[in-house]
């Protein structure tokens, strides 16, 4: 039998074996049989030793062509097997579009987030800027720039988280006010609110947390009066607790304001008659406020004889607790889905 006839028969048999391979494993066995180191095509090269030298190049070329032909057929068959496997898998996994779809759980905004955004929206509408600041703050801005000297009780190590002697976790968002005023170089107006997290060395219980949120507001301009502060706070109370709410101002003391006041809102549950929410007083304390102390203005670079201002600070945690009847501040931070789902239901009713 001639070498040419041997290659022709080998090619035909290889094509038959390739077409009969029904899976990738069988196809791999065919490849090894013909193209492996000890395969049939490799065996043809052994015949070259018996050929005249002038015939060896042509014979070697034909062997390589045969190898390439078989490889091409193997590749084509491989692609066909992969396609058949995929089609079979798709046929077995046909989706019945008439079946009911899967319910996708949709979340809702956290009650604290809702409260903060509601307050922000109100003040944005009044022309305020929202300014954020550092949670790790310098003692200088957290206390000294706010008229709190080194000897003030609020600077006690038991009340604040100090990192170094001059660096601490901010105890309020007031440093944002101090930095903002300083950056204006004594030129008004300043009209900002400062939301953010603050830190106190409190023991966690139903009404206290070592970390909570705070929103403070500041207005500095010429001829700012106490009546401007009162009007702003009345608008805030009506927005948060209802249009029929009233406020009252009680004298208080804060180092950075003079005069200072505590702000109460008429009880939204008993309408001022007295209940467990307002402790039978008819009023609920919601925030502290006052006229910016002249020392604070001067330290920030403002001429206190020309400029005046008011400031206020509130805890969205407390506002949300009052508004939604939440009795424990820790619920805000435990990420209990059962608790949060209640606010999704309220949202669906359009009550929030």
UniProtKB/Swiss-Prot annotation:
<dbReference type="GO" id="GO:0006432">
    <property type="term" value="P:phenylalanyl-tRNA aminoacylation"/>
</dbReference>
<dbReference type="GO" id="GO:0005737">
    <property type="term" value="C:cytoplasm"/>
</dbReference>
<dbReference type="GO" id="GO:0016740">
    <property type="term" value="F:transferase activity"/>
</dbReference>
<dbReference type="InterPro" id="IPR022911">
    <property type="entry name" value="Phe_tRNA_ligase_alpha1_bac"/>
</dbReference>
<comment type="subunit">
    <text>Tetramer of two alpha and two beta subunits.</text>
</comment>
<keyword id="KW-0648">Protein biosynthesis</keyword>
<dbReference type="GO" id="GO:0004826">
    <property type="term" value="F:phenylalanine-tRNA ligase activity"/>
</dbReference>
<keyword id="KW-0963">Cytoplasm</keyword>
<feature type="binding site">
    <location>
        <position position="258"/>
    </location>
    <ligand>
        <name>Mg(2+)</name>
    </ligand>
</feature>
<dbReference type="InterPro" id="IPR004529">
    <property type="entry name" value="Phe-tRNA-synth_IIc_asu"/>
</dbReference>
<dbReference type="InterPro" id="IPR004188">
    <property type="entry name" value="Phe-tRNA_ligase_II_N"/>
</dbReference>
<keyword id="KW-0436">Ligase</keyword>
<keyword id="KW-0547">Nucleotide-binding</keyword>
<keyword id="KW-0460">Magnesium</keyword>
<dbReference type="GO" id="GO:0140096">
    <property type="term" value="F:catalytic activity, acting on a protein"/>
</dbReference>
<dbReference type="InterPro" id="IPR006195">
    <property type="entry name" value="aa-tRNA-synth_II"/>
</dbReference>
<dbReference type="GO" id="GO:0000287">
    <property type="term" value="F:magnesium ion binding"/>
</dbReference>
<dbReference type="GO" id="GO:0005524">
    <property type="term" value="F:ATP binding"/>
</dbReference>
<dbReference type="GO" id="GO:0000049">
    <property type="term" value="F:tRNA binding"/>
</dbReference>
<keyword id="KW-0479">Metal-binding</keyword>
<dbReference type="InterPro" id="IPR045864">
    <property type="entry name" value="aa-tRNA-synth_II/BPL/LPL"/>
</dbReference>
<keyword id="KW-0067">ATP-binding</keyword>
<dbReference type="InterPro" id="IPR002319">
    <property type="entry name" value="Phenylalanyl-tRNA_Synthase"/>
</dbReference>
<dbReference type="Pfam" id="PF01409">
    <property type="entry name" value="tRNA-synt_2d"/>
</dbReference>
<dbReference type="InterPro" id="IPR010978">
    <property type="entry name" value="tRNA-bd_arm"/>
</dbReference>
<protein>
    <recommendedName>
        <fullName>Phenylalanine--tRNA ligase alpha subunit</fullName>
        <ecNumber>6.1.1.20</ecNumber>
    </recommendedName>
</protein>
<comment type="similarity">
    <text>Belongs to the class-II aminoacyl-tRNA synthetase family. Phe-tRNA synthetase alpha subunit type 1 subfamily.</text>
</comment>
<dbReference type="Pfam" id="PF02912">
    <property type="entry name" value="Phe_tRNA-synt_N"/>
</dbReference>
<keyword id="KW-0030">Aminoacyl-tRNA synthetase</keyword>
